Amino acid sequence: MTKYIVQGGHPLFGEVHISGAKNAAVAIIPAALLVDGVCRIENIPQISDVTALLKILEQLGANVRFLNRSDVEIDCRHIATTQVSQELAHKIRASYYLIGALLGRFGEAEVSMPGGCNFGGVRPIDQHVKGFAAMGAEVREGDFICAKANGDRMKGANVYLDVVSVGATMNIMMAAALADGTTVIENAAKEPHIVDLANFLNSMGANIKGAGTDTIRIFGVDKLHGGTYAIIPDQIEAGTYMAAVAACGGQVLVRGIIPKHMDCITAKLQEMGVQVEEQDDTLLVRRSGKLRRTNVKTLPYPGFPTDMQPQITVALCLAEGTSIVTEGVWDNRYRYVGELTRMGAQIRVEGRSAVIEGVDHLTAASVQAYDLRAGAAMVIAALAAEGTSEVSNVHYIERGYEDIIGKLRNLGAQIDSVECDETVETRQIG
């Protein structure tokens, strides 16, 4: 196993270029299964979740070829099976997107569900299954999710999501792209990566309207053709580096972003006293004075993203006064708080809220990454803390952040990756 050694207490200066969006890539790669042709996907992030999904596609019979570091060519014309390897599926939570893609193209799917599906007291797959069933599929749940269409193709249907679910919205879109008839998703999620998936599918010949609103209409077509598509920049990666500047101080130019996607994060950081200047596809982020307190509530897009909750919590630990962070998406996303208190943070969790009393500084400690975004928060805390910290279980961080060590070093951070023997049980979120 690997851990990070971080010498903290130094401001960050320089430029960071944002990679392709992880949350878009992990849906668009499975969506390539719907294409009866060769698709070229550009701006793919070099992260372990992407590697795992591409291996799954190869196991199913796809031909996968990297053209360069961030562009990949996928040929799904000769898929040999609709059964996904249990060993491969367990490596990535987003393997459930394979169900919608395989159902949409072949009318059947068998996918072993990853262990992260039941965290926080909620079963996120429920809304996916509801949509598949409405479209005529029989779905059996056990060690595997086995789904089969009633006939050769899925049937268009009206689907109302009981809760706003990004995963269900995207999975139903994929299942409906080649369906017989029109599918309407109501109470749909609106995140940028949902729009990106719809744009990818439309570029390959799908007919999807309304992505980015709460009602999406998918008019089923007979076939999708090959093409070229570039994934959007990663909103959460950009926000993570912005939060790091807030916590550590300094000045960083964040390049290759879509400013509109950053509005909710930018506004909250500005409330805290961070200066953010927008120009074209860049944000100049500066923090020199003391951070101000604020309150944050995570909500579905365009609200403040739940995947940024741990990172901004770290910055608020160093703000003057009392801040309250409320988690409005997941039932339980505060397991990392215990790690921050070991570094001197003053936080108490009350239900869905964390009450934060700002402190002058954090102190170095050995901490663990319990999930992807909390792991990023631990790195930020270690960068801001006085002394040398160790962050373990960093393989979860590498699920969603391309070359985080190299990018932070380019900003002047003193951070190294070393091998170790110890591992800790974790959960996958984000």
Per-region residue spans from a language model:
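Short, structured segments at the rim of ligand-binding sites
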Residues: 1-430
